[in-house]
Swiss-Prot record:
The RING-CH-type zinc finger domain is required for E3 ligase activity. Pathway: Protein modification; protein ubiquitination. This is E3 ubiquitin-protein ligase MARCHF1. Its main location: Golgi. Residues 13-69 are annotated as: Disordered. Residues 43-58 have a biased composition (Low complexity). Zn(2+) 1 binds at residues 80, 83, 107, 110. Coiled coil: none annotated. Residues 222-279 are annotated as: Responsible for down-regulation of CD86 and MHC class II cell surface expression. The gene is MARCHF1. It comes from Homo sapiens.
Amino acid sequence: MLGWCEAIARNPHRIPNNTRTPEISGDLADASQTSTLNEKSPGRSASRSSNISKASSPTTGTAPRSQSRLSVCPSTQDICRICHCEGDEESPLITPCRCTGTLRFVHQSCLHQWIKSSDTRCCELCKYDFIMETKLKPLRKWEKLQMTTSERRKIFCSVTFHVIAITCVVWSLYVLIDRTAEEIKQGNDNGVLEWPFWTKLVVVAIGFTGGLVFMYVQCKVYVQLWRRLKAYNRVIFVQNCPDTAKKLEKNFSCNVNTDIKDAVVVPVPQTGANSLPSAEGGPPEVVSV
């Protein structure tokens, strides 16, 4: 027994497996499990960190969307509500009505063209009557109305029919009046007026009344065409609405006041003969010649 114990003390690693105690084997098993957990933990932490980095970093597919959204955002500059262009020195923007927001600005030329084409003198949104100064062009510079072929055809047919109808009515009235005058002379001689005279008189009255009504209706159409032609060949200068002009002046004055309040006064050093440095008050320096 003593020899065997001495051999074990000299070489403890050569102990057979069946002779080791269960406590030693349990400690070794716990150590192996902790080592395996330590080996697996870096992989998990790395995967978690990679997931966090993926969630935090923006994907490449969303970058162009953000850029496209920024490009689609509307500009805050004032634009014309007809042509959607900005104003410049040649064609500035005016505020002719009481509309607010982006609909209050319009070009003078765009508004002039719209008034000529629509033949209206008020805003279609707020129904405010424009303050206009009109002036007709010289007759040499008049332009034709912009009409379709069907409208021109209708006008030509109506004028032709009107001329023919007026000619027929005038000729029939002349003939009836002439014959009626002859019958009146014969009746004065005989002392009796026959029934054809009264029949002709009724026909003349009906024809004359119908001719007057027809001429009145046609003349209304011609007057409307004449007004359209005059409106198309006039120079219009629309003035700013007084209400909107006052609001713009108030806003401008408020902005100027805020800019003045926010301005910082920087003191400027005086560079004069009186502002000499304090060192010059001491004894003068001697310069070697």
